[in-house]
Amino acid sequence: MHLNPSEISELIKSRIEGLEATAEVRTQGTVVSVTDGIVRIHGLSDVMQGEMLEFPGNTFGLALNLERDSVGAVVLGEYEHITEGDTVKCTGRILEVPVGEELIGRVVNALGQPIDGKGPITTKHSEPIEKIAPGVVWRQSVNQPVQTGLKAIDAMVPIGRGQRELIIGDRQTGKTAVAVDAIINQKGENMICIYVAIGQKASSISNVVRKLEEHGAMEYTIVVAATASESAAMQFIAPYSGCTMGEYFRDTGRDALIVYDDLTKQAWAYRQISLLLRRPPGREAYPGDVFYLHSRLLERAARVSAAYVEKETNGAVKGKTGSLTALPVIETQAGDVTAFVPTNVISITDGQIFLESDLFNAGIRPAINAGISVSRVGGAAQTKVIKKLGGGVRLALAQYRELAAFAQFASDLDEATRKQLERGKMVTELMKQPQYSTLSVSEMALTLFAVNKGYLDDVEVSRALAFESALRGFIRSKYGAILDKIETTKDLDAETEKELDAAIQDFKKNGTY
């Protein structure tokens, strides 16, 4: 057998050219210690802040502390199987979660994995959980309303699409109830809702999901759950995951509403992680960047311009603005709004709804304190008819609270003061509303119109809610066209006002309550 050297060299050349190098370049490190879900790693010289790290057993972690000779990472999920000496690899990726329509109607964990037993979720896209908020140039002013269906909120502290409105109060004052009612009321409003449950009992979350299903709200809602039994890391990242899911809808020219229930527990989880990472503690043992923790999350809620949507969708969606409205929840201790986290979030948001345990225990539910609850930008977005009729309500309540304090000491009151007190009592009574019974704009307008025009002046306060309910039923059955007109135009012209006047007078003559 004769071998030609040139043939051999050609053969070797072709083999070398056809060779596919399968070696992957990855930075590796070694686990030095594992304590309470915090892992110290030696090596990993090229790791990025917030990068995903791969541990043995298909477990992932986040690199949070980059020190001179070691890396502090937090494990996402179970960490019992990780031991000293294990190999850790860099992934070169920032933590991402799945986004898209496929998530609607599902319950997922902080990593976007389904936990409702309804099978896997296959989405076309995934996005990083940490994103920079849209700049000032890409934003638009808030001028479209978010109807919560609650009289006290829509009349006194209106919320607009793209606003951040804080719901703050002690435990057991109905904070979750207000947020869930707001979600239920978005039926048919073309609004995708995301409910992020942080550090709550699994049973409480399952109750909320059941209620949302009963009212048909899961058809447009995503639930992101990081229960109390999950690690602090999962509770810390859950709000960012939910926000990314909401941003997908905002950036495709749609409207989304996100509820963070609640951010106090996220701050606690972050404090726990920071202390375990040996970061220096500050006020109330929180780390120095706890303000940034919430500000970078809440700044992502915005109303964005059509140009921004066009840029984000590469020209696929034109002429549509998008919005992400945030309702963060904060729990206070004994009504103390001057604590560290409450003051931080109050200063970040565009207003707050303050719920008081005294009002709640007195049977005034939703227990909204009209005096210190404000909406800084929602007024421009308020529905015209509610704006016209609701102005007097806030004033009546504010004056009533003031006068009621004085009236305790005064024995004889003049007629005007007595009338004002009676009116305040009536308005307070009418602002009460049972849970899961949200009202449409026209139904709300009807109540406000009746109280403003003095149709309830001769009604006993204890019969006010019965009067309101009977009036609603009477008008809907006999004068339904008036309500439909208000619902369509979202305004009250002189002609409709006359018709409504006549209709209520008819009810007072012939109706029963």
Swiss-Prot record:
Q: Which Pfam families match?
A: ATP-synt_ab, ATP-synt_ab_C, ATP-synt_ab_N
- Name the chemical reaction catalysed here: ATP + H2O + 4 H(+)(in) = ADP + phosphate + 5 H(+)(out)
UniProt source species: Nitrosospira multiformis (strain ATCC 25196 / NCIMB 11849 / C 71)
- Put simply, this protein is called ATP synthase subunit alpha 1
Q: Which gene encodes it?
A: atpA1
Q: What does this protein do?
A: Produces ATP from ADP in the presence of a proton gradient across the membrane. The alpha chain is a regulatory subunit.
**What is one cellular component GO term in this UniProt entry?**
plasma membrane
Topology of the protein relative to the lipid bilayer: Peripheral membrane protein
**UniProt KW Nucleotide-binding keyword:** yes
What GO MF annotations does this protein's record show? Answer: ADP binding; ATP binding; proton-transporting ATP synthase activity, rotational mechanism
Q: What is its EC number?
A: 7.1.2.2
The residues that the entry says bind ATP are G169, D170, R171, Q172, T173, G174, K175, T176
What keywords is this UniProt entry annotated with? ATP synthesis, ATP-binding, Cell inner membrane, Cell membrane, CF(1), Hydrogen ion transport, Ion transport, Membrane, Nucleotide-binding, Translocase, Transport
Record family assignment: Belongs to the ATPase alpha/beta chains family.
NCBIfam families assigned:
atpA, PRK13343.1
Which residue positions hold the site described Required for activity?
A: S373
Q: Quaternary arrangement and interactors, per the entry?
A: F-type ATPases have 2 components, CF(1) - the catalytic core - and CF(0) - the membrane proton channel. CF(1) has five subunits: alpha(3), beta(3), gamma(1), delta(1), epsilon(1). CF(0) has three main subunits: a(1), b(2) and c(9-12). The alpha and beta chains form an alternating ring which encloses part of the gamma chain. CF(1) is attached to CF(0) by a central stalk formed by the gamma and epsilon chains, while a peripheral stalk is formed by the delta and b chains.
Q: Where in the cell is it found?
A: Cell inner membrane
